[in-house]
A protein has these predicted regions:
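Catalytic-core regions of core metabolic enzymes
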Residues: 1-157
Length: 157
C-alpha cells in the first residue's frame, strides 16, 4: 500500500495521519494528489503539485465550468496549466476514484457505503466507468450483490 500525506497549512493530525504544511514539504515521491479545497485555491495547489513533480491529480470540488463566467475562466486556466505542465487530471467536480480490488483497495471519494470488492482479474469482477457522479452513486447503490473491481468517475471539462 501507499502512504497518505495530508497537507494542511496549520499542520497537525488529520484522520490519524500527520500532516505537512505545504505540498512542497512532502518528503516522499507522490503518485497522486487528491485536491479537496475551496475552488479559488485549486489552481495554486495544482501549480505547487506540478512544481513538486506530481503529475497525477484528482480534483473533487466544483466551481469550474459549471459555475458561470468565473468558473469558466478557472476551468480554462486549469486546462492550460495541465497542458503546459504535462498533468493528468481527473475532475474537477467529480465524485472521485474508487478501486475495490481487495489486494489494492483505494477510494478517494465522498461516496458512502461502497460495495465489497472483487479481484480485478476474476471473471465475476465488474469495472464501471462513469462521467457522472450521480450515475456512479446510483450504480453503487443499486448494484449491491455485484462484486466490483473499480468504479472511477472522471469528469472531463
Amino acid at each position: 500500500g501507499g502512504r497518505v500525506v495530508p497537507v494542511n497549512p496549520k499542520g497537525g493530525t488529520i484522520f490519524g495521519y500527520d500532516s505537512v504544511t505545504s505540498i512542497g514539504a512532502i518528503a516522499t515521491p507522490v503518485d497522486l494528489a487528491v485536491i479537496v479545497i475551496r475552488p479559488d485555491a485549486i489552481l495554486d495547489a495544482v501549480r505547487e503539485s506540478a512544481d513538486r513533480g506530481i503529475r497525477n491529480l484528482l480534483i473533487l470540488p466544483g466551481g469550474f465550468a459549471e459555475a458561470g463566467p468565473i468558473g469558466i475562466a478557472r476551468s480554462e486556466a486549469l486546462l492550460k496549466l495541465a497542458a503546459e505542465r504535462g498533468l493528468t487530471i481527473a475532475g474537477p467536480n467529480c465524485a472521485g476514484l474508487i478501486h475495490l480490488d481487495p489486494e489494492w483497495r483505494f477510494a478517494a471519494t465522498f461516496l458512502r457505503d461502497l460495495p465489497p470488492g472483487s479481484k480485478a482479474a476474476t471473471s465475476n469482477g465488474l469495472a464501471f466507468i462513469s462521467q457522472s457522479g450521480a450515475l456512479a452513486e446510483e450504480f453503487i447503490d443499486k448494484a449491491k450483490g455485484f462484486r466490483h473491481s473499480a468504479v472511477p468517475q472522471p469528469r472531463k471539462q
